[in-house]
């Protein structure tokens, strides 16, 4: 095997003890290998090897590399030589400060206040018929339940809250946060001095670990989907194969189409039992209402009471999404043809 990349990393195991490790990538006859070698503190000649990846996909190997390296750096390891395949992101000052506020909120939020804000979000989302995350993310509610603003001026110092959002929901938030006791005041510059650089860096790598894990899972899911579609599998079989819900599978199929892959074989299979006239009615509804929202199309085609079907209402939405993939593909093709002149 030919070693094409190697780096050494270290971390402090105690006040005076330093641990070393080696990260390597090798290739032999088109097969990529990625590994980690721990060296004993007491005996340099003693080592423990861990094979992280072995296979033919360079892209998958890179995903594994980034994820596993982020895990190790989150545990305190740092490369002795920067660069290579390691991505070192330089954060602007404002971005770094906002991330420090997020870090602090994940460790010191008041759970009772957070729970009350979550209850508000559920009720308001239901009354507005919106997804809860559209009102406020978990991250934002953590920030609110940590720093406990008492005025609109303080509220606007929370990352993610602008004038419009403060005007829309600020009174509701302040009704919860302003009555909770707090120990520290605004402005929040004291947070930046209270957080140690090393603990913050480890937390940043934990965030990267989660990000790269999602990327790796998505890459492997896409590969399984494409292989399954090529093999003639339907949604239910792919669900059993991947352990992913049918809704998540449909979202992944939409993304694959955006990336230039064809999922038409699966669409044909899933729509075999749907009458051609019914499919045409859905298509015309997309032409009339656009393809952003499914509910207007559903009501246009089926009225207020869609016909009963095995799988309930969800099967109707699945078919709408599958036809929407075709519709968007044709619309994109028409746009490309128009702009080529």
Locate the predicted segments by residue.
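Short Lys/Arg-enriched helix C-cap and helix-to-coil transition segments
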Residues: 177-193, 260-275, 328-341
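Linker/hinge segments immediately adjacent to helix-turn-helix/homeobox DNA-binding domains
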Residues: 119, 181-210
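Structure-specific DNA junction-binding interface
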Residues: 1-135, 146-148, 153-157, 168, ...
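Accessory beta->alpha helical hairpin/"wing" motif in late/C-terminal subdomains of nucleic-acid enzymes
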Residues: 167-177
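Positively charged, polyanion-binding regions of nucleic-acid-associated proteins
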Residues: 225, 273-291
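Residues in the helix-turn-helix
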Residues: 165, 248
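Short, Lys/Arg-enriched anionic-surface-contact patches
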Residues: 126-138, 201-221, 263-278
